[in-house]
Amino acid sequence: MSKEVLNDAEQRMTKATEALGRELAKLRAGRANPAMLDRITVEYYGAETPLNQLATISVPEARLLVIQPFDKSSISDIERAIQKSDLGLTPSNDGTVIRITIPPLTEERRRDLTKLVKKSAEEAKVAVRNIRRDANDDLKKRQKDGELTEDDLRRVTEDVQKLTDKYIEQIDQKAEAKEKEIMEV
C-alpha cells in the first residue's frame, strides 16, 4: 500500500526535476546549444511548426549555431521567426543555411539569467514540496481508513521526507551548475 504512494511520489518528483533540466537547457549561457531554439515556432504553409521539425540544428563551434532547413523555401520564414523570438539572436543566411553567432553575455544579462535560474529552481522545489504534501495527505487518509498503522505512517512519512530531501538537493545542484556556467566568462 505505502510502496505505491512512495513510487508515485518518486515518479512525480523525477518529472519535476527533469522539467527543471529542460527549462535550464533553454537558458542561453554564452555557448551555442540547439535547445535554445526549442521554443521557436515557424509559420510554415499556414501552420505554426516547431523549428526542429523544419531543419537540422548543429553546433560547429562553441558560439555558432547552424540551421539547415529541409525545405530551402522556408529559410526566410525561419529567419523571421528567430528575429521575432525573445532570444536576442541575429540570424544571417547564405541561401542554403542560417548561421547564428551567439554574442558573449554582458554582466547585466548574466545577473538576469542567474535570477531566472533561481526562480526556475524555486518553482521546481515548490512542485516537489507539493508532491510531498499530496503523498503525506494520502498516507494520513489511508491511516484514518485503517490501511496503515501509526508506526507505518511515521516510517513512510520519513521515507517521503528523505525522498523530498534527495530531489531538493538535485534541484540545488542543477541550479548551482547552471549559475556557474552562466557566470563563467
Swiss-Prot record:
It comes from the Bacteria. GO terms for biological process: translational termination. The keyword Ribosomal protein does not apply. Responsible for the release of ribosomes from messenger RNA at the termination of protein biosynthesis. May increase the efficiency of translation by recycling ribosomes from one round of translation to another. Keywords: Cytoplasm, Protein biosynthesis. Gene3D superfamilies: 3.30.1360.40, Ribosome-recycling factor (1.10.132.20). This is Ribosome-recycling factor. HAMAP family: RRF. InterPro entries: Ribosome_recyc_fac (IPR002661), Ribosome_recyc_fac_dom (IPR023584), RRF_sf (IPR036191). It is found in: Cytoplasm. NCBIfam families: frr. Its main location: cytoplasm. Belongs to the RRF family. GO terms for cellular component: cytoplasm. One of its GO terms (molecular function) is ribosomal large subunit binding.
